[in-house]
Amino acid sequence: MKTVLIAVALLCSMEASVMAESSVSFEADAVGAAPKGWTATKTGQGNPKWTVEQDGAAPSKILKQSGTATYPLLLKDNTEIRDGFIEIMFKAIAGKEDRAAGVVWRARDANNYYVVRANALEDNVVPYKTVEGVRSSLDIVGRKGGYGVSAQVPANEWLKLRVEFTGSRFRVLYTGQQLFEVEDRTFGEAGKIGLWTKADSVTLFDKVLYGATK
């Protein structure tokens, strides 16, 4: 009987942690237009440009950021998620100053959020928090200081970036492999998920998935 009860408890625990997944499609959006259901904004100055495009290398429409701003930002409307995940496929196309793609979570607004980004010029993946418009890198669990993790980020290739966030603990996965975990309590409330680039990065996004932990 005890074994059965333990098994039931474990099953309930697993079910409680199931994530309700939503997938984003740009098929209904016009090519060259901003995607519906998202708010295009920025942290800092500049003119970001988010458009839906048809990419010959992808079977469906994709999203492109080709403007220039301090940090171009695209927030998903009607997402208030405290614990959950966001996952993307991205392709870094161009950029002299930067060539980056990032995912955002728990965003209060354009100046307050978490982001983890991959950079094809630096070949690394780095977690940050942006507080009142000021960005600072986060320490990785088990290591004090440093600047993210070195990782090959080849340009013009589709790559996967994912973050899972529960409470103050964040787990970052790149190309399907866990890179690191982060512990931070700056933003503990639910917020929006989103997409992010930096400076003159020209970046493509596809297969955007997100969800909340039930």
Language model segments and positions:
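Short, aromatic/His-centered strand-loop micro-motif at the edge of beta-sheets
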Residues: 134-162
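Bacterial N-terminal signal peptides
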Residues: 6-15
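Short, solvent-exposed beta-strand-to-loop segments that form ligand-recognition rims
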Residues: 168, 173-194
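Extracellular glycan-recognition surfaces and repeat-rich motifs
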Residues: 33-62, 68-70
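Ligand-recognition surfaces built from glycine- and aromatic
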Residues: 187-214
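Secretory/extracellular carbohydrate-interaction modules
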Residues: 31, 65-135
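Extracellular beta-strand elements of beta-rich domains used
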Residues: 26, 88, 163, 206-210
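Boundary at the C-terminal end of the N-terminal hydrophobic targeting segment
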Residues: 16-22
